[in-house]
């Protein structure tokens, strides 16, 4: 199949990478797993056995008229432990390489079908200036966009850093979440070829 390249000849690409049927269940599974893997999972609370103090019985068992109590760190008490205390946990989910690649292919194919993937011969700016990047994106009528280049472009990354709904990455930095998060994906011809090789 062929991808249209702005201001250049069409690019021949693999049908299996850019023309595959959309697998919603797979994409959902991989996106959820990717987001889950980004969770810190460091929350921690203390149970009654972990809270400092509470070793001595506050008052004797019988004869005071008060409710019986064995520790001042009971979950019922103020400053007591937490009944079902949250503990650090690993939220990451297992995703096979085949599934991950399949999801990326599915997303890229859907972007092509929805005319959300724009391919250009080259995309760079002379200086790390946000103003320059804004002007260049305005020419292409883009504002909510992920820019993917074949190699690391320091100027582009620095200029995009301060823009809302604009991100610049090299091919190694793309992931399922970033591909679905933006309205458009702008790729250089070199990046398209690299993605194709990566997912072959």
From Swiss-Prot:
Gene Ontology MF terms: rRNA binding; structural constituent of ribosome
Entry annotated with the keyword rRNA-binding: yes
Record InterPro entries: Ribosomal_uL4, Ribosomal_uL4-like, Ribosomal_uL4_dom_sf
NCBIfam families in the cross-refs: rplD_bact (TIGR03953)
PANTHER family in the cross-refs: 50S RIBOSOMAL PROTEIN L4, LARGE RIBOSOMAL SUBUNIT PROTEIN UL4M
Task of the protein: One of the primary rRNA binding proteins, this protein initially binds near the 5'-end of the 23S rRNA. It is important during the early stages of 50S assembly. It makes multiple contacts with different domains of the 23S rRNA in the assembled 50S subunit and ribosome. Forms part of the polypeptide exit tunnel.
Subunit structure: Part of the 50S ribosomal subunit.
Protein name as it appears in the record: Large ribosomal subunit protein uL4
Organism of provenance: Aliivibrio salmonicida (strain LFI1238)
Lineage per the UniProt record: Bacteria, Pseudomonadati, Pseudomonadota, Gammaproteobacteria, Vibrionales
